[in-house]
Amino acid sequence: MISLGLILFSSVLCHVATAGRTCPKPDDIPFATVVPLKTFYDPGEQIAYTCQPGYVFRGLTRRFTCPLTGVWPTNTVRCIPRVCPFAGILENGAVRYTTFEYPNTISFACNTGFYLNGSSSAKCTEEGKWSVDLPVCTRVTCPPPSVPKFATLSVFKPLATNNSLYGNKAVFECLPHYAMFGNDTITCTAHGNWTTLPECREVKCPFPSRPDNGFVNYPAKQILYYKDKAMYGCHDTYTLDGPEVVECNKFGNWSAQPSCKASCKLSVKKATVLYQGERVKLQEKFKDGMLHGQKVSFYCKNKEKKCSYTEDAECIDGTIEIPKCFKEHSSLAFWKTDASDVKPC
């Protein structure tokens, strides 16, 4: 007959053998939750992994049972982001992105001359869909430009709607007697407006003054306006210093103030000089004197080196300074060689 003590001892051994060890809290998986979540589990208890919204399950199984060994089986659970479909091609624009995965955001931008019609960004949602549809890039247009006062449109080619596209230009002209301040050309900008309009202002100039030893002709009218012209001239033996024709400019001044400069009488009777790169006889080429602004080069001797060099002389309003190194060759001293005939240094 089996004793009661032996029976109790056997039952304790059996319980220890079948109870096993408890399992610890399972590994944390990014973007996943465990149900039920406890600090330890008895052998035979089950857990299940669930992915958070926006993520999908990858692995062999999502359910695990705590074994008698107290060690969880190898866990291959992964929760990966949902991937939204290709966003599409934005015509006349660009889609900027790093990835199409949840919860990333993509942005939209239009090329210069187009504006965004729709949202500037879209987010990949938990369902793997984009939060908004692909926008549209619409071409920028400008309304008909305003015409400045006292101006006319000289160049303008609008659309059939009378609007203009980005980059289109309009060119203005001022009415007679009016000068333009600012750029005569305006451009339709990427913002749908025109660049700054110019301004047309009436401009008057004083009557031009007559130069000494000369004359000036201009239109016979009471007032001289912008773009009116005057013509200058000089008396005999005087040379005009400045343009022959001047114009009333936009600032109410004449474009130049010409003057009449006197010719130069030459004290040298005989010399060979350089004029515009050619050797000429001074007494023949300039028998009536040199005009203001004319320049010649006189030949001089370098006695030490026995060679010649040139120095310039210019007629300036009736005055010319003959180089000091120049020595006029006398016809009586026929045995002497003129500096112009000596080899150059």
From Swiss-Prot:
One of its GO terms (biological process) is plasminogen activation. Keywords: Disulfide bond, Glycoprotein, Heparin-binding, Repeat, Secreted, Signal, Sushi. SMART domains: CCP. The keyword RNA-binding does not apply. GO terms for molecular function: heparin binding; identical protein binding; lipoprotein lipase activator activity; phospholipid binding. Expressed by the liver and secreted in plasma. Residues 263-345 are annotated as: Sushi-like. It comes from the Eukaryota. This is Beta-2-glycoprotein 1. The lineage of its organism: Eukaryota, Metazoa, Chordata, Craniata, Vertebrata. The gene is APOH.
